[in-house]
């Protein structure tokens, strides 16, 4: 079985958050869930998260503000917006800020799972490219510091 991503679910509506977290866990995901943007950012600094699923309209930090912070500090994390906020401007802004996708509530659970798996595939491919680039950079540095006859 393919490794499943570690998820962070952010939604201020506790019944919705708990129900979705429970269902995702039953599907096999490891899920952390919080009710505020500030709690989410604190958790992101402490934990390894692969994918964030966040609402947009929340007290304190909005989902868009959370997305901006993630893009600034946690580039390797994919973000799926899952919201009842259906304005086209929010969708466009989310995508411009770097969201992987934008899903409307109510949603089809199976479709969300497909989007999670797609986002995780994109994340893994990007992580592999970054690792190869870092290895190439290290090899280039080693080669440039080496000269014939020099003992290392």
What positions do the PLM features span?
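Receiver (REC) domain active-site loop signature in two-component systems and cognate sites
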Residues: 58
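Short amphipathic alpha-helix used as the core "switch/output" element in two-component signaling
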Residues: 42, 64-75
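Short hydrophobic/Thr-rich beta-strand motif most characteristic of the beta2 strand and flanking loop
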Residues: 28-35, 43
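Acidic catalytic/metal-coordinating carboxylates
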Residues: 5, 35-39, 62-65
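C-terminal output helix
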Residues: 107-117
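CheY-like receiver
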Residues: 122-152
